[in-house]
Amino acid sequence: MSSGDEAVAAAAQRARVTAARNIPVFGDLPLPADTANLREGANLDDALLALLPLVGVWRGEGEGRAAHGDYRFGQQIVVSHDGGDYLNWEARSWHLDDDGEYARPGLRETGFWRFVSDPGDPEESQAIELLLAHSAGYIELFYGRPLNQSSWELVTDALARSKSGMLVGGAKRLYGIIEGGDLAYVEERVDADGGLVPHLSARLTRFVG
């Protein structure tokens, strides 16, 4: 069996496992439950079909750059929906030590992916909105577009910081589904000199969906 065949077989086996998983929910609420598995729950809103590959739970590791130097982190991203015209987004990460073990909590963000709805401007209606609240004390609004069926690019349009929040610059993010069905991304942020510099990157494997 060639390496390519082995990769396909491994992906198929992984899909059989992840397809049976979903995020936990409380079953007594009188509204559609969140689901991170497109095989279960409400149908995905047609307005979100260009974001369909993102739905799921993703886990993996990445690299970050901070003032004290580079570091490695683990991360889980949950992308779910309830049939509405938005995707729920929750990302949390943790620092890893030199042995690849948990060291301490890291960055955390939560928010929503939406498409701009402007019947008067069909081109603008293809724009993505990503609204994020960060545990470090700031709120961020991204706008972007799908680059193709499996990659998306977004850039910060507005940023608001609380009095206790971290001082940060705007960012540019690129997400994509890559070889093996993994989710990869890179984030650049504006530094003190006003230029975009590498900040975060990660490769995550599907865990649910």
UniProtKB/Swiss-Prot annotation:
Details of cofactor binding: Binds 1 heme b group per subunit, that coordinates a highly solvent-exposed Fe(III) atom.
User: Any idea which UniProt keywords this protein has?
Assistant: Heme, Iron, Isomerase, Metal-binding
**Required co-factor?**
heme b
Q: Does the keyword Heme apply?
A: yes
Q: What does this protein do?
A: Heme-binding protein able to scavenge peroxynitrite and to protect free L-tyrosine against peroxynitrite-mediated nitration, by acting as a peroxynitrite isomerase that converts peroxynitrite to nitrate. Therefore, this protein likely plays a role in peroxynitrite sensing and in the detoxification of reactive nitrogen and oxygen species (RNS and ROS, respectively). Is able to bind nitric oxide (NO) in vitro, but may act as a sensor of peroxynitrite levels in vivo.
Summarize the subunit comment. Answer: Homodimer.
Name the UniProt record assigns to this protein: Peroxynitrite isomerase 2
Species name: Mycolicibacterium vanbaalenii (strain DSM 7251 / JCM 13017 / BCRC 16820 / KCTC 9966 / NRRL B-24157 / PYR-1) (Mycobacterium vanbaalenii)
